[in-house]
C-alpha cells in the first residue's frame, strides 16, 4: 500500500526562539509502508542547543515527537513514542535530519522543526 507523507519544515517564532525563513521549502514525500523517510532541517542560526521535531495531523493539535540535544548529540523522545521510530543526525554544521523508521499510514502529516531552549 502506498501513501503520502507530507513534509513541511517550518520555524515557530515566539520571542525566546531562534527562527529562520524557509522561503517555501515545502517537501512532499511518498513512501511504502514499512520503509523509512528523512526530513531535513537547515538552520542559519548560531548557538543552537535544541532542535525540536513536531508532527501536525489534520484535526489534531501539533505533537512534539522529540528534541535533539546538540551538546550531547542525543534524541529525547516524548513519552509514549517507540524507541527506534525516530532519530536525528547531523550530516553537516547547521543541518539536521529526522529519520522516520517503519512507516505506517498514521505517520502522514506535516512535520516541523524548530529551535529554542529546551
Curated annotation (Swiss-Prot):
InterPro entries: Ig-like_dom (IPR007110), Ig-like_dom_sf (IPR036179), Ig-like_fold (IPR013783), Ig_V-set (IPR013106), TRG_var/const_region (IPR051117)
Position of the signal peptide: 1-17
GO cellular component: external side of plasma membrane; plasma membrane; T cell receptor complex
Intrachain S-S bonds: 41-113
A Pfam family that the UniProt record links to this protein: V-set
Protein location: Cell membrane
Keywords tagged on the record: Adaptive immunity, Cell membrane, Disulfide bond, Glycoprotein, Immunity, Immunoglobulin domain, Innate immunity, Membrane, Receptor, Signal, T cell receptor
A single GO molecular function term of this UniProt record: MHC protein binding
Main location: membrane
Any one biological process term the GO annotation gives: adaptive immune response
Residues of the Ig-like domain: 18-118
Subunit-level organization: Gamma-delta TR is a heterodimer composed of a gamma and delta chain; disulfide-linked. The gamma-delta TR is associated with the transmembrane signaling CD3 coreceptor proteins following the stoichiometry: a single gamma-delta TR heterodimer associates with one CD3D-CD3E heterodimer, one CD3G-CD3E heterodimer and one CD247 homodimer forming a stable octameric structure. Upon activation, gamma-delta TR complex associates with FCER1G to initiate intracellular signaling.
Annotated protein name in UniProt: T cell receptor gamma variable 3
Lineage: Eukaryota, Metazoa, Chordata, Craniata, Vertebrata
Amino acid at each position: 500500500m502506498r501513501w503520502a507523507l507530507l513534509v513541511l519544515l517550518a520555524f515557530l517564532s515566539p520571542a525566546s526562539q531562534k527562527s529562520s525563513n524557509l522561503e517555501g521549502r515545502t517537501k512532499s514525500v511518498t513512501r511504502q509502508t514499512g520503509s523509512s523517510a528523512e526530513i531535513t532541517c537547515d538552520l542559519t542560526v548560531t548557538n543552537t542547543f535544541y532542535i525540536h521535531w513536531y508532527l501536525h495531523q489534520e484535526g489534531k493539535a501539533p505533537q512534539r515527537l522529540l528534541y535533539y540535544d546538540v551538546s550531547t548529540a542525543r534524541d529525547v523522545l516524548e513519552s509514549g513514542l517507540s524507541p527506534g521510530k525516530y532519530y536525528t543526525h547531523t550530516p553537516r554544521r547547521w543541518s539536521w535530519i529526522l529519520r522516520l523508521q517503519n512507516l505506517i499510514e498514521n505517520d502522514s502529516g506535516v512535520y516541523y522543526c524548530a529551535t529554542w531552549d529546551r
